[in-house]
Amino acid sequence: MNLSKQARERVAKVVKNGAVLIHGNKTVYRNNDANYQFRQFSDFHYLTEWPEPDAHAVILVNDSVPELHMFVLDKNEEMETWDGKRIGQQGAIELYGATKAYSNSQYSDELINLLKGHTEIYCDYSSSVFQEIDQKILNLAVPYDQRGGNFSKANIHSIQPILSELRLIKQSGELELLQKACDISIEGHLAAMKFTKPGDYEYQVAAEMEKTFYHLGAERLGYNSIVAGGDNSCILHYATNREELQDGKLLLIDAAAEYGMYSSDITRTFPINGKYTPEQKAVYLEVLKAQNTGIEMVTTKSTMQEVHKTTIASISESLVDLGLVPQGVEETISMMHYFEFFMHGTGHWLGLDVHDAGSNELDNEPRKFAPGMVTTIEPGIYVRPSKPIIKFPLIDRDPEKLKVRRKEMGMEAATKLEQKEMQEAKTIEHEIPKSLLGIGVRIEDNILCTDSESVNLTEALPRNIEEIENICS
């Protein structure tokens, strides 16, 4: 359990002296006594790698040296007969590096003793255990001091900012697990491409792909698979996966495996019959152009905001060339007309969570990429069939200007003003080329920032049109 040991050591260097309280996930029931597959809370896994529910951890830090105390389910022969083996307290010490381990039923009583002498306490405010137990215990463990100017001896901090910063930079062991998740996901996508044909159903393609994930060692899906044929490719988080695949249409698959708790996140869009139409090819190549530009920018010289801004510019040029917008590139950007066809971000952090921990800003400024960061790059163009004619508002909606105004006026007041301006704005009506309606294309890869250049962890899954057609045919 070397990864969590290293993580605790990194946390201890930040905390220096204090205590960290962190809680694992509970079993979640689907109905009656049938439960969902258990997955550990990512922050708890990061610090302990503990795989069982209903666990707590207290990390005592003295002079930047961490000491792990675990509270876990007891060994219980009867319960293990029903639900499987339990690791128990001895296993927590021998296998997971705990200095001492207790029954989870002892948490409230032992926490008081463990916290004695510690006044810097780091907690997970979002945890129900913090709200139900920790807050009450802290008043007893670190008593109020009304003799001096300070009302309490305890300084309570959120552990989330520390963990988010640490999780943002992947260590070598984490990158190995993430690469394995990517490799498994690639094979699943290839299986789907080879399997797909007109007349199949979306769920059949999903089954073929997910079978490959599990066959190659995935513990679970990174997220619910999106297998979106035809018009469904224009639905960003489509997850019904029940419709029949039509000849001449596209299939957009956004799906990935999770391995060692780390998730990949890949999207490919390919022809159901193995051959792109000229219109599909035109849209696809524009998205690919934008993605290639974005991938090249994942270096220590750029920020996520700069990547997104460049992607918007590329997509906007494409929308003009494809005849999807009524004005030029400058107006398409400044009036946010591109948002009708590209309405999401260009990327997000990737790791233990598919939308992983970490902020795009540092000290209220856009954050530069740093070695060890992993992001997706996933531009798209979605020509929704439900909008053959679009009324575009003729009003400046530059995101940077809106951001400044929101800071000056406050979010609520600025949002109300924006809505009012949109309602009162003049519009220009534009008819969308019929041959493009229902075409949705997204291409998504997983990109590692290094000291020198970006590394595409999912490069082995083809993006080139000829390669894709060869696989699908």
Regions found by a protein language model. Name each.
Residues 1-473:
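Active-site neighborhoods and metal-handling regions in enzymes and metal-associated proteins
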